[in-house]
Amino acid sequence: MILATFIALFFSLSAYTDIQGREDQPLSVPHLKKSVMEAKNVPALLDAEDVPFTTIGCVNWSAYPYKPEAQFRIAHADSLIFIHYRVSEECVAALATDGGAVFKDACCEFFIMPADDGIYYNFETNCIGSLLLEEGIGKGALRSAAPKQVLSLVRRWASLGTQTFSLRQEPTTWELTLIIPVEAFFHHQLTSLSGRTMRANFYKCGNGLCQRHYLSWQPIRTPNPDFHQSAYFGTLMYQP
């Protein structure tokens, strides 16, 4: 009995240590030699610069075990952030438009804290490029939505097009890109990303899909699904 307890404790601590190790590993964000202005050209740009994909693969809550294939890659050009998502899942939907409940659709999210003031931004984008962007310290009433003119600054491309559609219960692979200028951080006065270190997390979700799921890049230790947990953000290091 004692031996069995010891073995169980050993493997539990090993798993915890592995998670802790992944949390403590900063992600280097390469500084690109070239840039593009159209979001549809981001995949080719990142291919040319050999920017690797990183998996969004943490299943944090046992009540939601479904794990679609989800990856992201990120780079910057001093005043621009380039993000490329690649997803394969069993069903998709895209009912929300800009400023709407995109998290109920097939959705990828980028939460980032650009300074040490506790304020973070949530860039939530569904599979047709509809964007929800807010800033604040907590969630709900503590957050402020971005004005429409700020949303328009974030250039987007989606492989599934831009037209809304209802639930499709069929295996689907889709891609999404964003070009985020520093002006999109509308509560801050950023001019350059080079050399900066920021806290962030990436998510894949689908609250209204046939297989509800909540994946993250960095693990989250809360009893219930909650992406607004900046204490569990990982580290992004923007290369000079």
Residues of each region from the PLM?
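Bacterial Sec-dependent N-terminal signal peptides
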Residues: 1-24
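Structural preference for beta-rich elements and adjacent junctions enriched in aromatics
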Residues: 16-240
